[in-house]
Amino acid sequence: MAGLYSLGVSVFSDQGGRKYMEDVTQIVVEPEPAAEDKPAPVPRRALGLPATPTLAGVGPSEKGPAAARDPAPDAAASLPAGRCCRRRSSVAFFAVCDGHGGREAAQFAREHLWGFIKKQKGFTSSEPAKVCAAIRKGFLACHLAMWKKLAEWPKTMTGLPSTSGTTASVVIIRGMKMYVAHVGDSGVVLGIQDDPKDDFVRAVEVTQDHKPELPKERERIEGLGGSVMNKSGVNRVVWKRPRLTHSGPVRRSTVIDQIPFLAVARALGDLWSYDFFSGKFVVSPEPDTSVHTLDPRKHKYIILGSDGLWNMVPPQDAISMCQDQEEKKYLMGEQGQSCAKMLVNRALGRWRQRMLRADNTSAIVICISPEVDNQGNFTNEDELFLNLTDSPTYNSQETCVMTSSPSSTPPIKSPEEDAWPRLSSKDHIPALVRSNAFSEKFLEVPAEIARGNIQTVVMTSKDSETLEENCPKALTLRIHDSLNNTLSVGLIPTNSTNTIMDQKNLKMSTPGQMKAQEVERTPPANFKRTLEESNSGPLMKKHRRNGLSRSSGAQASSLPTASQRRHSVKLTLRRRLRGQRKMGNPLLHQHRKTVCVC
């Protein structure tokens, strides 16, 4: 019955609304390896051996028909030893892996799981029990191989080894047999049409999710010393780890933190769950396996999907959607999107309807047709058509198609795009030096200014706007002339939108006037004062005595005169009176000093 059907395969994946894409899919089609149990009989003449010797009582007449039944020597001589005379068909491998805690485990399973399975002893056997045992051994071998790669995987934010793991749902089609193996919550659904006269195709769940709350899984976990804890309505396997502040060997007195960690009871990877007392993994890598005999007249669809699909689309709805899509394609001639892409888009739409952040969603849809396609094996943009009897070969290395769906996370901004504006002026801009206005030492003056050669720098409006973007607050650069003591230049950029370097922004004053301005400076309007300060009258900044006379002896000759000091005192008194007038009615004035008796 082999060769009486063809397969139409479509695959699609979407990141959803998650920050990382951890779903991977894999499709491999390659010639079936030779059987181990019953090797094909090869004629002795083809191997260059003499014919069967004549036994006693066996005449030439009995030997002749036996020799006549052998194939022609020249026809079989071209075949190598141990090979069957008939053409071998191909075996198809399909896998969906949903990673967690990082993409490393899912990527490793996609690249190596099929290789570990097919090299196990008994996989090419004709007995289904031996094939299932070989598949289980392949899962365990892949899991142990991850242990050797653990040191190469990136560590967690706390510096611990990687906690990466993955679910795995595998379908292997060889001849008329379909082998299913899975760990985790990625499921496989089979569409069966019971009555050929009835168009209804019912959905059969081939796999059962490995959840920690299942009695069988909970009993196994607790038997290994683990536990299951409910967190936010979800049952999770508990990770028992020493407290992060602990260093050294783990003893009985070591504080152990119990963290509800993983929502599946079986997975590949998750090496953190190894129990040293029992020598087993609390999160088991051993898969559940099953065997199904395909009947092209009854079995119509095989769907592999991650939990992002099955959490939103029930199995029966998924089968009905695929059936409707195929009817539109073949009966009405509409060449729309593939079944896998349609299912993923429907799932993403339901995530949005429920106002939830969509999970990574992946699907592989296999449509079984009872008629062999005369077009042979070919692929198009969305689908792959296979006839396994023609020994096709296919290997999908990049089947995870990243799409820009409405639920997808926007791409990360490239590092070349600098969000901060940069100055593009060709003129030389002096470095900004921060100093205290009342420090004992003034800024060093450039030689050009010391000689009295002060050049005015003209900036364009474009450069000034760029400078204002980097200087949102008013910035004052004061250059004190410690040699001539004649001028003090202040460069004051403002926050106005149309700012240019004009005479208003370039202020020149004598050292005496600069000192008076520093003394008379008042706080801004939004400055908060305490109760004691408000009761003691207007606020005045106290300046240090002889703050400007400590620099050098050459500066003593240019100190302000007595008349200038009296003028500054008058300005200070005016400021005080002006502040008192703003307080309003004198009857409402508060006392300068208030004593509270409790």
Swiss-Prot record:
E.C. no: 3.1.3.16
Note accompanying the cofactor annotation: Binds 2 magnesium or manganese ions per subunit.
Binding annotation for Mn(2+) 1: D98, G99
Bias (Basic residues): 564-581
Keywords, alphabetical: Cell cycle, Cytoplasm, Hydrolase, Magnesium, Manganese, Metal-binding, Nucleus, Phosphoprotein, Protein phosphatase
Location of the PPM-type phosphatase domain: 57-368
GO BP terms, alphabetized: cellular response to starvation; DNA damage response, signal transduction by p53 class mediator; DNA methylation-dependent constitutive heterochromatin formation; G2/M transition of mitotic cell cycle; response to bacterium
Biased composition (Polar residues): 548-563
Known tissue expression: Ubiquitously expressed.
GO terms, molecular function: metal ion binding; mitogen-activated protein kinase binding; protein serine/threonine phosphatase activity
Principal place of residence: nucleus
Effect of loss of the gene: Knockout mice show defective spermatogenesis. On histological sections, testes display an abnormal architecture and considerably narrower seminiferous tubules than those of wild-type mice, accompanied by changes in heterochromatin structure and globally altered gene expression in germ cells, and depletion of the most differentiated germ cell types.
Family: Belongs to the PP2C family.
Record protein name field: Protein phosphatase 1D
Organism listed in the record: Mus musculus
